[in-house]
Amino acid sequence: MKLFRLSVILMGLALSATMMAQGIIRHKTPVTTSSTKRQTAQPAASPAKQQAVAQLIGNMVHVQGGTFTMGRTSSKAYWCDDSDKPAHQVTVGSFYICKYEVTQKLWKAFMGSNPSWTKGDNMPVAWVNWVTAQKFIRKLNAFSGKKFRLPTEAEWEYAARGGNRSHNYLYSGSDDINDVAWWADNSGNKLHPVGTKLPNELDLYDMTGNVFEWCSDWQEPYQGSAQTNPKGPQSGNAKIKRGGDIYSYNSTCGVMSRSQCRPDIATCCGLRLVCDRL
């Protein structure tokens, strides 16, 4: 009887081995869920982007809102440009603005390329048109979860003047342009690292000179009436840029001076970021 049982067991083992070899019996394959696949497919966050965003947030300055006179007044200006007139009262709300222009390091972290002629991680990115600036901001916001944007022209001028700490300087931080700006007379026609001149009353650097800075507004003539948080017209042919650049003369660099350019044209223009909250 024992021999019979043993022979039956051996026959069963042999049959099982044969069926496995022929693929009749298969081991269960672990089920991979769609969520597991998604987790596996997600790339690791870029350390360069994380570092760039952390540095950007650390350099944001809170600007307390207030009311100021926007446009050209006759008190210190010794030239006249009708686009800067008439002076008018404007009220802006509080916002955050970066103390530096967007650097080439920050730009490259999200765009991969660098359009600037003078290269250097700590130099402002330049030769950026308005359309590409918006593309950069969308990528930055998608990664950071923040809502960075370009300043309105009113926000830009309010910050350049020093906000509610303003001393009414002709340039952003001084009546002597050489204190605060890289411009036609001292730049050597090349970009310079951000933050190497004196800041203005809000601790903002290079609001005058180095590179023009894009604003969000379409260009239109000033109306002269008091306004609150103006954003410009809904459409137009040119976008506002402010502050002057390394090729600009002092008549273009005043805190009230206005310039404009088509949004698809790249000049010696960069950008400075603002946001409503951090």
Regions found by a protein language model. Give the residues of each.
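Signature tryptophan residues that serve as conserved aromatic anchors
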Residues: 107, 130, 156, 182-183, ...
